[in-house]
Amino acid sequence: WVKLCEKTPLVKKGADGIEIKDYKEICLTHHERLDGNSGMVLVSAAIREVDGQDKKHLMIMVPLGMALPPGLRAAVYTKDQWAKIAKNEKVDDKELKPVDLKYSLCHASGCTAEIEADAAIVDQMKAGGGLMVVAMNAAAQPIGFPVPLDGFTEAFAGKPVDNAEYKKARGQLMAQIRERQQAALEKYK
């Protein structure tokens, strides 16, 4: 988990009809899981906070190819439940409090769904072991996307990381993935 913040211009019209540019700080406490071979984002989850707004939002992105009408379902698992999942043990679903998210946007990287993240959701995430995201694929089969919550509480409460440093580290990771792809191609020539 990492916290990223940046000042973003929000343009609105004043009473006289003239556009006013107002800068708001938008922060994302964010986690993404990448495919180590392709670099494609498999799942991404974030809490979005906008300066001056009380409401926070839980945003989840899954890859393209999911059925849109059903939306997403996400549930926070306790640390004990998450440990059971890691061992492929059965978890009692009755204890879960899933939330349904509707897709709001699809783009080249995937489709994003969001919901207001009230204090109960944020508190569950702080205390939880993991967030299980379930989407339906085009064949109407449920696909699970696990998101560990290790480090969420510290990132959410902490200061944002330097955006330039994050961009540099992410660029290095993508370079490693491209090298791996190149090595695999060379192997099969």
Can you say where each PLM-predicted feature lies in the sequence?
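A generic "folded-domain core" signal
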Residues: 1-189
